[in-house]
């Protein structure tokens, strides 16, 4: 809920919010075999006020996330608070950022992400599986020129992962122009087929 996250960001405050952005290496080079665009949380010379902090709290404002970095951040919730380093070739995974979240915080968020899919009212419930525990989060990013712009488009996001080391997968899917097509729910439905295929092969 945008209101919840906006209020949370205001309660956290600019100093702590920006500190966590930096802890997550948002804006820094992503360690990867190929060149990637950097994520960002603020433009240069941006005036920071309560409206900006509130918008940033629910992923709007000037936040631009590289999908690979977002997927890496989600890995911390099944890795006791440490973020895995992304890589192309399957092999031993290295840790990129250690202990960015506490084990307790990671466990709490993991349980919330599980409910997004396990709960019948969850936004990701349509990909629920009886035989494997899935955790995920949907999101919709508005792309518009100003607060009053009603003609802008939307990006739909969905990240899903298993919590079982025997069936490890983490997928982040982004679909452009999901406005009037079901928002992030449209993305969930298009994530289902590749996820089902992977799980059926295990």
Predicted regions and their residues:
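Beta-lactam-recognizing serine transpeptidase/beta-lactamase-like catalytic domain environment
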Residues: 1-175
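Noncatalytic linker/hinge segments flanking ATPase motor cores
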Residues: 12-13, 178-179, 201
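Short, gly/Ser/Thr-rich active-site loops of penicillin-recognizing serine hydrolases
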Residues: 94-97, 188-202
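A short acidic/glycine-rich loop-to-helix N-cap element
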Residues: 176-189
């Amino acid at each position: 809920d945008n209101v919840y996250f906006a209020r949370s960001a205001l309660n956290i405050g600019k100093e702590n919010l920006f500190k966590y952005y930096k802890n997550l290496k948002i804006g820094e080079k992503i360690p990867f075999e190929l060149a990637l665009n950097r994520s960002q949380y603020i433009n240069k010379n941006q005036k920071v006020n309560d409206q900006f902090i509130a918008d940033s709290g629910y992923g709007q404002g000037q936040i631009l996330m590289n999908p690979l970095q977002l997927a890496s951040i989600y890995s911390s919730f099944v890795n006791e608070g440490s973020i895995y380093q992304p890589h192309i070739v399957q092999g031993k995974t290295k840790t990129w950022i250690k202990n960015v979240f506490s084990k307790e915080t990671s466990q709490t968020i993991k349980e919330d992400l599980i409910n997004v899919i396990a709960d019948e009212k969850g936004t990701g419930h349509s990909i629920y599986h009886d035989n494997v525990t899935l955790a995920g989060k949907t999101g919709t990013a508005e792309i518009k020129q100003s607060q009053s712009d009603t003609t802008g488009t939307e990006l739909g996001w969905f990240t899903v992962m298993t919590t079982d080391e025997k069936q490890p997968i983490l997928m982040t899917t982004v679909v452009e122009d999901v406005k009037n097509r079901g928002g992030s729910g449209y993305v969930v439905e298009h994530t289902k087929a590749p996820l089902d295929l992977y799980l059926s092969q295990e």
